[in-house]
Regions:
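NAD(P)H-dependent oxidoreductase Rossmann-fold/reductase module
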Residues: 52-76, 150, 281-297, 301-447
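Conserved NAD(P)H cofactor-binding loop of Rossmann-fold oxidoreductase domains
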Residues: 161, 189-198, 215-224
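A glycine-rich helix->loop->beta "capping" turn
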Residues: 171-200
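Canonical Rossmann dinucleotide-binding motif of NAD(H)/NADP(H)-dependent dehydrogenases/reductases
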Residues: 90-124
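Glycine-rich phosphate-binding loop and adjoining beta1-alpha1-beta2 segment
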Residues: 117-155
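Cysteine-centered motifs
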Residues: 16-19
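Catalytic loop of short-chain dehydrogenase/reductase
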Residues: 206-313, 320-343
Length: 447
C-alpha cells in the first residue's frame, strides 16, 4: 500500500508534507484525487503518482536534481549517433561495464550494445527517486538504456550497489555464469570520492591536490562565469596513498582476479580502464598531483593484468581520453576553464567529440580494428585530436589571455554549461520542461 501525506490548504494541487512540492495525484486512468489529507491505494497497478515540474538545482559542481525524460532523450541521442555509424566489425559480444551509469562508462555501454549488438551487464551505485526527490541522473540513464536495449532485442542487466564490495562482485559473476557464460570485454570506469577495502573494512578517501608545493593558477567559477585565481594547498600526510587506494588500479585488479578465478573471461578477452593526461597547465593538479599518482598505479596494474590475461590471448589497456564535461571532471579545479577554452577551439575546427563519439572511436577504431595504435607507454590515445600541436598552441595562447571580460570571446562557456546541464537531463530541445513529469522511474532488471 502506498500512502502519501498531503496538505490541501490553499493550493490548486496539494503539497507533499515531506518535501513541500506541489504535486498532482492521479491513477493510471488519469483521474484527479482531492478532498482528503491522506490517500491510500490498495494496488500497485492503480497507485498514486506524484507528478511534478522538475528544474535544475545546482550546488557547486553538482546538480541535485535530474530530469527522467531529459536523461532518456540524452541516452537516445547517444544511441542514434552510434547506430548511424554502422555495425562495429568483430566487436564485443558480451560486455561487463563497471561504472556504467554516467559519462564515459555509460557511453561505453551504449557503444558496445548499439554499435556491436553486445549483451551488457552494468554496475553502478545510484539513488532512485524517494520522498519527493528525483533519482540521480545515473539511475534515469540506466533505466532509459535498459528500455532502449529491450526494444532492440538486446540483453541488458544492471546491478546497483557498491562495486568495490565483494558481494556485488559475487552477484555479477553469478549473473554472468547464468546468463552469458563468459564475457569478452570488461570496462572499468569507476570514479568515486571514497572506497571501502572489502577485506579490512578500511575506508579510503581521495583528494585532488598538487604534490610538494601549493599550486596557483586561473580558475573558472562555473556558477558565476568569473575567471579568478585559485590556490590549492599540497598533499599532506597519507593523501597520496589514500587517493591511490581509491582511484588507482587496486579494485580493477580485484575485479579481474575474481572474474579469472570464476572462469568467466572468454578467450581473447580485453579489459580497459580510463585515464587522462592533458596539457601542462593542468599537470600540477592532475598528472603530477595525487590523482596522477593514482593513474600511475592504474598503469602498473594494466601491465600486470596484461600478463595475467596472456594465457587467454587477452589484453589489458589504459585508454587516455579527451577532456570533457562529466560529473567527475567538473569537480577538478582549473579543468573547467581549460575545457571551455578547448571546446571553443575544437568546435571551430570540427574535431570536437563528446563521450559517445570517444567511446565509439575507442571500440571501432582501436580495440576492435586490429590496430590499437598504443603510444610508447602502451596506452591507447583517443585524446589524440585534443593534443595536436595546433589545438594546444591555440588553447595555450587563449589561456594566457582569458579573463572574465573576454571569456565569451575566447572560451565556449555556454557550451560548457549546456553540456553540464545535459548530464542531468536538462537543456534538451525535444523535452517539455514546463510540463509535469513522473520522477519515479524503474530500472527493469532491478524491478
Amino acid at each position: 500500500m502506498l500512502v502519501i501525506p498531503i496538505n490541501l490548504v490553499g493550493t490548486k494541487y496539494p503539497l507533499c508534507v515531506n518535501c513541500h512540492r506541489q504535486i498532482r495525484l492521479t491513477t493510471n486512468a488519469g483521474a484527479d484525487f482531492a478532498g482528503a489529507k491522506t490517500v491510500a491505494s490498495p494496488a500497485l497497478g492503480d497507485r498514486l503518482r506524484p507528478d511534478m515540474i522538475i528544474t535544475p538545482k545546482i550546488r557547486g559542481f553538482i546538480c541535485t536534481t535530474a530530469h527522467p525524460e531529459g536523461c532518456a532523450q540524452h541516452v537516445a541521442e547517444q544511441i542514434a549517433i552510434v547506430k548511424n555509424r554502422g555495425l562495429i566489425e568483430n566487436g564485443p559480444k558480451k560486455v561487463l561495464v563497471i561504472g556504467s551509469s554516467t559519462g564515459y562508462g555509460l557511453s561505453s555501454r551504449i557503444a558496445a550494445a548499439f554499435g556491436a549488438n553486445a549483451a551488457t551487464i552494468g554496475v553502478f551505485f545510484e539513488r532512485p527517486s524517494e520522498n519527493g526527490r528525483t533519482a540521480t541522473a545515473g539511475w534515469y540513464n540506466s533505466a532509459a538504456f535498459e528500455k532502449e536495449a529491450a526494444a532492440a532485442g538486446l540483453y541488458a542487466r544492471s546491478f546497483n550497489g557498491d562495486a568495490f564490495s565483494d558481494p556485488v562482485k559475487a552477484e555479477v559473476i553469478a549473473a554472468i555464469k547464468a546468463d552469458l557464460g563468459k564475457v569478452d570485454l570488461v570496462i572499468y570506469s569507476l570514479a568515486s570520492p571514497r572506497r571501502t577495502e572489502p577485506k579490512t573494512g578500511e575506508v579510503y578517501k581521495s583528494v585532488l591536490k598538487p604534490i610538494g608545493e601549493s599550486y596557483t593558477n586561473k580558475n573558472l567559477n562555473t556558477t558565476t562565469g568569473v575567471v579568478n585565481e585559485i590556490t590549492i594547498e599540497p598533499a599532506e600526510g597519507d593523501d597520496i596513498e589514500q587517493t591511490t587506494a581509491v582511484m588507482g588500479g587496486a579494485d580493477w585488479q580485484l575485479w579481474m582476479d575474481a572474474l579469472l578465478e570464476a572462469d568467466v573471461l572468454a578467450e581473447g578477452v580485453q579489459t580497459v580502464s580510463y585515464s587522462y593526461i592533458g596539457p601542462e597547465v593542468t599537470w600540477p593538479i592532475y598528472k603530477n598531483g595525487t590523482i596522477g599518482r593514482a593513474k600511475e598505479d592504474l598503469e602498473n596494474v594494466q601491465r600486470a593484468l596484461d600478463t595475467q590475461l596472456a594465457p587467454l590471448n587477452g589484453k589489458a589497456w589504459v585508454s587516455v581520453n579527451k577532456a570533457l564535461v562529466t560529473q567527475a571532471s567538473s569537480a577538478i579545479p582549473v579543468v573547467p576553464l581549460y575545457i571551455s577554452l578547448l571546446y571553443k577551439v575544437m568546435k571551430a575546427e570540427g574535431s570536437h567529440e563528446d563521450t559517445i563519439e570517444q567511446m565509439d572511436r575507442l571500440l571501432r577504431d582501436r580495440l576492435y580494428s586490429g590496430s590499437p595504435q598504443p603510444d610508447n607507454a602502451g596506452r591507447i590515445r583517443v585524446d589524440d585530436w585534443e593534443m595536436t600541436p595546433q589545438v594546444q598552441e591555440t588553447v595555450g595562447k587563449n589561456w594566457d589571455e582569458v579573463s572574465t571580460e573576454n571569456l565569451s570571446q575566447l572560451a565556449d562557456f555556454d557550451g560548457y554549461q549546456t553540456s553540464f546541464l545535459r548530464l542531468f537531463g536538462f537543456g534538451l530541445s525535444s523535452v517539455d520542461y514546463a510540463s509535469e513529469t513522473e520522477p519515479d522511474v524503474a530500472i527493469p532488471s532491478l524491478s
